């Protein structure tokens, strides 16, 4: 075989020309110890707090503690394959999630990865999960209503776009149900919804997803799920990830509603991570910055001014109390951060008053400015009547011989309590709510038996839609009771009342 020197030199030249000197420079560290979802890493001298680092196998970790000779890292995934001596690389990135309309209708985890089996998410934009809340000048005071579809909430403790309204109460008394109703009520509005499930059972999250799917609400909703079996670091970060998704809509002049279900479990997850990192514990063993943890999250809900597009992010955080103790550490913290609370009570729930909202303890500090005039006109009387009823009810339990005026107030109050009851997943539009409240506060129900009120209400909407459709149309358009609307509605209520009494005789 003849060796051609020219050919060989040509091949070598080609090889040299095509040689690409790829040197990958990365700052690395070594795992000193690992356990309980926390790794201690030696090295990584220039690493920054909240930076992502990469363990072997592509598992990410979040840098939380920067100490003299090591770094405390919360592992955001399965830690069983990570061992002492493993090499850890810096990524130079801060945790980000995909945002935009691509995430609507999807169930994702804290990192934004889909967990619903519907394929990858093709989002055109990602955002950091930790950003600074809008400043004072960037904001505008809350002035537009954000309807929950629940009469008790929209009349007594109204929520405005850009508000933070806490839902607080013991376990299993309908806190999530109130939040889901609020999502369903946004169906024909321009509000996008984010539901953050934090530390919940996977079956509960699947149930919520099924309910939203069934009612056609999933098309404008994203579910961010960090379930009970997920690492504590992911449960702690889930609300921030969901908030970034909601902020995309807020910053683009749109409106979003976010539900944190619930922040008690998020606080417990953060406590777990902090104690494992050996941070000094404070009251109830929570770390010293637990208040800041919640305040920096909830301050991101805001109504922006017109120059910034007038978008809004409304937050409904949920807190679970133990035996109604609202003076515990986390409940008092979140109550002080939010703009009001909806307090749910077990006694009311078991008495069949659902949603079990305690009207006396529930308050909305800024929602009044967002209430439409029509609702204000009926809710003012309603609040007064309810307060008098509660007072008289306690008094009436002792005395049987009551004068006619007191009897009348008790009768009216009992009917108003009945009106405020509402079946689950049946949110009402504003015009329907003000119609039934107008009927109640103006005495149209006083002569009806209590057990007939639910049937009366259901029939009333159908009656007005068929015979007096102009009433709903006018209320929707004018958002206030004019003399003309009042006259027409009073006439309709009189007509329907007579018709209804004949059917129940």
UniProtKB/Swiss-Prot annotation:
Required for activity, annotated site positions: 362
Cellular component terms (Gene Ontology): plasma membrane; proton-transporting ATP synthase complex
Binding site residues for ATP: 169-176
Catalyzed reaction equations: ATP + H2O + 4 H(+)(in) = ADP + phosphate + 5 H(+)(out)
First-tier enzyme category under EC: translocase
SUPFAM superfamilies: C-terminal domain of alpha and beta subunits of F1 ATP synthase, N-terminal domain of alpha and beta subunits of F1 ATP synthase, P-loop containing nucleoside triphosphate hydrolases
UniProt GO MF annotations: ADP binding; ATP binding; proton-transporting ATP synthase activity, rotational mechanism
Keywords: ATP synthesis, ATP-binding, Cell inner membrane, Cell membrane, CF(1), Hydrogen ion transport, Ion transport, Membrane, Nucleotide-binding, Translocase, Transport
Subcellular location: Cell inner membrane
PROSITE patterns cross-referenced by the UniProt entry: ATPASE_ALPHA_BETA (PS00152)
Record-listed E.C. numbers: 7.1.2.2
Membrane topology reported for the UniProt record: Peripheral membrane protein
Superkingdom, natural source: Bacteria
HAMAP family xref list: ATP_synth_alpha_bact (MF_01346)
Family according to the record: Belongs to the ATPase alpha/beta chains family.
Complex formation: F-type ATPases have 2 components, CF(1) - the catalytic core - and CF(0) - the membrane proton channel. CF(1) has five subunits: alpha(3), beta(3), gamma(1), delta(1), epsilon(1). CF(0) has three main subunits: a(1), b(2) and c(9-12). The alpha and beta chains form an alternating ring which encloses part of the gamma chain. CF(1) is attached to CF(0) by a central stalk formed by the gamma and epsilon chains, while a peripheral stalk is formed by the delta and b chains.
The protein's role, per its UniProt record: Produces ATP from ADP in the presence of a proton gradient across the membrane. The alpha chain is a regulatory subunit.
Descriptive protein name: ATP synthase subunit alpha
Species whose genome carries this gene: Desulfosudis oleivorans (strain DSM 6200 / JCM 39069 / Hxd3)
Taxonomic lineage of the native organism: Bacteria, Pseudomonadati, Thermodesulfobacteriota, Desulfobacteria, Desulfobacterales
Name of the gene: atpA
